[in-house]
Swiss-Prot record:
This cephalomyotropic peptide stimulates contractile activity of cockroach protodeum (hindgut). The modification Glycine amide is found at G8. It comes from Rhyparobia maderae (Madeira cockroach). This is Leucokinin-8. Keywords: Amidation, Neuropeptide, Secreted. The lineage of its organism: Eukaryota, Metazoa, Ecdysozoa, Arthropoda, Hexapoda.
């Protein structure tokens, strides 16, 4: 998901 650490 579009998180601070995970964009995938």
């Amino acid at each position: 998901g579009a998180d601070f650490y995970s964009w995938g």
